[in-house]
Amino acid sequence: MNVTHVTLSPGAKTPVKLASKTGEILVKNFTNGDLLVSIEKEDFEKNYVKIPALMAEVLSECSTHSSTRSYFFDDVYLKSTAGGEVEIRCLKV
């Protein structure tokens, strides 16, 4: 299982390169503030998931799936209101 640990600064958008491409991740927010997570670099402010402090969420790239193929990603963009530790686990490799 591929696991990435990241230390975030408050308010800074941080790009994270995962060890391998995946279609699903588990993001654990160990910070004391909200965590914004996106796989969209350009449209980060429009396309993100908000994970509350000390919570976790499974995220899947389902909007680009078709009946013939799936798209995987290896870039994740994070932004925390409080800064602190975040863990990302690749679930589908």
What function would you assign to each model-found segment?
Residues 3-21:
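Surface-exposed ligand/attachment interfaces on beta-rich extracellular proteins
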Residues 27-31, 78-82, 90:
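Asparagine-centered strand-capping/turn motif at beta-strand->loop junctions
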